[in-house]
Amino acid sequence: MQSIKLVVVGDGAVGKTCLLISYTSNSFPTEYVPTVFDNYSANVMVDNKTVSLGLWDTAGQEDYDRLRPLSYPQTDVFLICFAIISQTSYTNVKSKWWPEVTHHCPNCTIILVGTKCDLREDKESLEKLREKHQQPLTFQQGEQMAKEIKAFCYMECSALTQKGLKQVFDEAIKAVIFPDRDKATNKKNSKCSIL
């Protein structure tokens, strides 16, 4: 059985731990808990192929910049995450996370993930953004960033509603076990462009 190591990175509070907890337990943590997710391993079936999936959470805060890369060796696929309601986390994809990941793992597969997509329609979140003269990031902005960092694809999900959540992990697994898939064909025919 093939083993896959998946590491999740991104700014603090973009929802990395919630993404992992929601995926592995089908429940959403109700309070913010900075990185308490233990490494998790499970057998997962994707396209009639069973793989042993190892999930690794990381702390996004600067305090952990020197420790975080210790979890990178032997990584098969990274999920670089940003919150669709945080311009700063989006900007940091290119200025911090992509350079860090590609420095330590130059040939690794990257999936860019826009988290908290449920908040694109949330009145309270939209009002807070309006007060700062901002708006949620668009799917097209995510796709553009994915092209710029040469990510395998861009996907969006919500750990709260689980919309697109399973598809993110399925796509990450497929990107590793079927590396020769034509990306152009993949973008047209797969679940990679989920809203």
UniProtKB/Swiss-Prot annotation:
Keywords attached to this entry: Cell membrane, GTP-binding, Lipoprotein, Membrane, Methylation, Nucleotide-binding, Prenylation
NCBIfam families: small_GTP (TIGR00231)
Residues lipid-modified (S-geranylgeranyl cysteine): 192
UniProt main location, coarse: membrane
Pfam families from the UniProt entry: Ras (PF00071)
Sequence positions that bind GTP: 10-17, 57-61, 115-118
The organism of origin for this protein: Dictyostelium discoideum (Social amoeba)
Motif Effector region, residue numbers: 32-40
Subunit-level organization: Interacts with pakB.
Propeptide: 193-195
Modified residues annotated as Cysteine methyl ester in this record: 192
Domain of life per record: Eukaryota
Gene Ontology MF terms in the entry: GTP binding; GTPase activity; protein kinase binding
InterPro entries: P-loop_NTPase, Small_GTP-bd, Small_GTPase, Small_GTPase_Rho
PROSITE patterns on file: RHO
Residue ranges that the Swiss-Prot or TrEMBL entry lists as coiled coil: none
Membrane topology type: Lipid-anchor
Protein name as annotated: Rho-related protein racB
GO biological process: actin filament organization; actin filament polymerization; aggregation involved in sorocarp development; chemotaxis; cortical cytoskeleton organization; establishment or maintenance of cell polarity; macropinocytosis; regulation of actin cytoskeleton organization
Localization per record: Cell membrane
Record family assignment: Belongs to the small GTPase superfamily. Rho family.
GO cellular component entries: cell projection; cytoplasm; cytoplasmic vesicle; cytoskeleton; lipid droplet; plasma membrane
